Amino acid sequence: MTEITVEKLATEVGKTVDRLIEQFAQAGIKKAKADTVSESEKQQLLDFLKKQHGADAQPTKMTLQRKTVSTLSVSSGGGQSKDVKVEVRKKRTFVKRDGNEAALKAEEEARAQAEAQAKAEAEAKAKAEAEAKAKADAEAKAKAKAEAEAKAKASASAAKEQPKPVESEEAKAEAARLKSQQEEAAKSKAAQEEAAAKEKARLLAEENAARWAEEERRRIEAERYGDHHVTTSKVARAAEDSADLDDEKRGRRNRNKTQTKSKRGGKDAREGREKHMKYKSTPESMAHGFNKPVAAVTRDVRIGETVTVAELAQKMAVKATEIIKAMMKMGSMVTINQVLDQETAQLVAEEMGHKVVLLRENELEHQVLADRDDEGTTKLEPRAPVVTIMGHVDHGKTSLLDYIRRTKVAAGEAGGITQHIGAYHVETDNGMITFLDTPGHAAFTAMRARGAKATDIVILVVAADDGVMPQTIEAIQHAKAGNVPLIVAVNKMDKPEADIDRVKNELSQHGVMSEDWGGENMFCYVSAKTGQGVDELLEAILLQAEVLELKAVRDGMAAGVVIESQLDKGRGPVATVLVQEGTLRQGDIVLCGLEYGKIRAMKDENGRPIMEAGPSIPVEILGLSGVPSAGDEATVVRDERKAREVALYRQGKFRDVKLARQQKSKLENMFANMTEGEVQELNIVLKADVQGSLEAITDSLRKLSTDEVKVNIIASGVGALTETDATLAAASNAIMVGFNVRADAQARKTIESEAVDLRYYSVIYDLIDEVKSAMSGMLSPEFKQQIIGLAEVRDVFKSPKLGAIAGCMVIEGIVKRSAPIRVLRENVVIYEGELESLRRFKDDVNEVRNGMECGIGVKNYNDVRVGDQIEVFETIEVARTL
């Protein structure tokens, strides 16, 4: 097969190039990215990986069991014999030596043999060289000496002959000396070579030890951090072998007993064996390669508008109990399914050391509201001012507006007071003005606040004969909070008791100064009855509007605010919308708070149908999916399907947030709720004609609650009283209250059959007063003790039947037989009980009047003395009021 590069091989095996190069290096092969890989190198790498991962691990031990059964005939008494089975068992264990261990041992033996052979060869070689060198030196010396002697002998005249044996002995001695020197040199050289060989062997052993230690360390790291399945398989095999050995030993010990029992017991023994096998010990749990993190893990927790405790725990990767414990430390008791608001969840997550990312889940809402027709946004045109008339009740707000509109609105109001926000537009000679008429009663605070929010100018109506009142002050506060200019209309100037200076003085105490006194507020003096000063008031309004330079976009999609809403029986949900920009047309798709819909019809304040309405025009629209809340923003959008999605999303979010707040309120009021059983509850099902009145009545009724009687509005809504409302009232023992609405036919049947208390009202004063009287009837009555008579003991007689009888003179009031009494001695009560007998001249009587004598027997009391006083009293019930 052709050789391939490292990069291509990494692609084939599915690993990174760096990882493959690292594995080659661990196997002892140095490779670069562009180098080629041969088949032998592949095989070498494969062998290394198998060895590292333990894939080539095979059983190193094998146990063979042999069983031989023979029959032995044994004689018994009576000349008979019986056969006895003899079973011989043999067990042999064969151990397979590890190939690596054998190779290492052979390598060590070969190394030792090589070192010994090298040492012997070195010694023999050194010895032979020394002997040869000594022999050569001896021969050379002997030859030189012989030549010198021959020359000397030839040149000398007379030479003395010397014996040869001496010369040969000297040569031999010299040769022996040289030989010994050579041998010493050879031995020293051999010793040096031996020391070098030992040093080399020591270094090799150290190198091998270091290499084996490194391999052991890598194996341990691989088991700890490496592939979980590889390390687990090794441990599993080892554990399985150990368990098999234990089971086999245990089986050998118990086999004889089990076999005996099985012969005797049959089925029971079989069941015992099965039970034993069922509950036999299992190998210990295998270790895993996961290590518990020692450092705290910080996560980015994404939190929406609402989140449950379980969801928050999942996002933070902790148990829900940890969050519950953390919130208990923070002072809140929660459950696992409880909904938390965004702020609470953020506090908990940050307390537990995580980073919080707040999500904007209303992305669809922003997208829908951004996809609007912006045509002509730069083309601003003047618009009519929106004027809100505020003031105290009965100061003539509606009458003044009635004179301006030349109609009779005030006469048609129930009780002569305004209970709705009336929206009207008036054409004057100088331009159009839109008026919002707000209620003056204290219960309509929210309606006045909405009026100030949607307005450009506030007209504060103050009666010249009444001055500044609580709702006047509240209207001033609303105007200041909304940063709206204020024009003061001093009404009822036709009355003789009108006092302008008093009104100015009282208003100045609340920061409203007239221009005459150096202030910024215009004062107009008007009379709704005669029409005095009305034209000046309109001019002041238009002048203030010119100063404000009120402009709005006339073209494009409309946007406005819901002034009032109601549920009409024939028309369905009806909303009064004040257009603030754009043009509202019939057929537009409107997104209005939690509701949406296509405008089916539009009407002006007089009930006439219209097709479109521009800025600052109040209009009634029909076709919404439900009754919107007053104060909601009404916006025209393109797509009805997306408008429905946004409305449903808002409803879900509103429901979740409301639930979270209710739960929080319940937990915070836990101790207060413990005494709820002692508090009387007045349940009310309330229906009103418009949203504003419903809010006002609900708020006023809840303020009536006391420590002893609580007003509980179990259901409220806009529209007629239905059968569902009647059924709910009957089930909860509630009274039904209708404000300017009536019950339908089905509801009346249910009310009659269930005997539900139904009450209709058209004036809010009457409703509040009657609910207050109903609450008074639910108060527990007070009991008062009233003294009705006093008798003085003049003498004491003994009676065999009644014991001590007191002869008394009635000195005050009446003494009655049925009334309880007290016995007083020196004006201290010593006994309280009841009369047993009351007689006059031996006759039993029911009562004895002042100035008469009588005999009194006190029940269960005989210690009556002369001079004691007997006080007669009765307990009367006193009704309480709020």
From Swiss-Prot:
UniProt entry keywords in alphabetical sequence: Cytoplasm, GTP-binding, Initiation factor, Nucleotide-binding, Protein biosynthesis
**Which residue intervals are annotated with compositional bias (Basic residues) in the record?**
251-264
- Stretches of Basic and acidic residues bias are at 95-152, 161-202, 265-274
Spans annotated as G3:
437-440
**Which residue numbers delimit the tr-type G domain?**
382-551
* Ranges where the record places region G4: 491-494
Region G1: list its residue ranges. Answer: 391-398
Q: Which region ranges are annotated with the description G2? A: 416-420
* PANTHER family reported in the protein's UniProt record: TR-TYPE G DOMAIN-CONTAINING PROTEIN (PTHR43381:SF5), TRANSLATION INITIATION FACTOR IF-2-RELATED (PTHR43381)
Would you tell me the protein name for this molecule? Translation initiation factor IF-2
> What role does this protein play?
One of the essential components for the initiation of protein synthesis. Protects formylmethionyl-tRNA from spontaneous hydrolysis and promotes its binding to the 30S ribosomal subunits. Also involved in the hydrolysis of GTP during the formation of the 70S ribosomal complex.
**Residues binding GTP, per UniProt:** 391-398, 437-441, 491-494
Q: Which GO terms describe its molecular function?
A: GTP binding; GTPase activity; guanosine tetraphosphate binding; translation initiation factor activity
